[in-house]
Amino acid sequence: MASPLELRRRIRSVDNTRQITRAMQLVAASRMRRAQEAVQAARPYATHISGMIERLVLATGNDRLPPILQPRPIERTAFLVLTTNRGLAGPLNTNIVRTAVSEIDATSDAIEISVVVVGKKGHLALRGLYTLSAVFTDISDQPSVLDIAPVTQLLVDGYERGDFDEVRMVYPEFVNILTQQPRVVRLFPVVLPEVQQDAREADIIFEPDPASVLEALIPRFVEMTVYRAMLELAASEQSARMVAMRAATENATELIEGLRLAYNKLRQARITSEIIDIASGANALADA
């Protein structure tokens, strides 16, 4: 059985850990709110750029669409896997990697696979399973469009060169604080938004011509798609970390209560033993 001194030391150690996890929980909660606000702030731009592409596609015509919008036979597929740089985020990265591995392994053996990873956790998990075409581990957990530009440029250039015929992205969708759902979406060929009736009826003049504007706008649309996914990743990471640290804090509190109970029982037993010894000595002296 542990001594009172050992129990006191362990109580102090667990209490110090609890203070750390509590602080990390509060920091994650603050960052999660900022990440959610960033997701909300990006939506108007995404909505407007989607509407503009609707009008440009209608004005351009299917025969003049840029190559990035035109499907072709799939012989090479690239997977963009978005993960975090840091751990202590519960099962978030494990679920993302598991979804990515499932999607990659389900791809036909006749299709050549390329894997592009964002985040140190994805790099560590996937480097032993596949040959990674590129790894990005220097992107901030509060990303900007400029931060993800090298990623999207790599994919756009590779698709235009014919290095791959399809690009799929694996990332976590922030549903709520307790739920982050891994999703797989196709980046290339770009999935065209459905042309709405008001877009068909809109009379807009594009200069120099709709095809040129569309070709210049599509990379921005891809950037926004990846950027929004990175914002979802940031919100998911902070919410998962907040939940994990809250659970760790609660577990530490329960452990401290158990240790204090054991310490008090041991201390009470020692006091009782000392009282018995004193009483026995007093009785022995009285009998003498």
Label each region the model flagged.
Residues 1-288:
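C-terminal beta-strand-loop-alpha-helix "lid" module of Rossmann-like NAD(P)-dependent dehydrogenases
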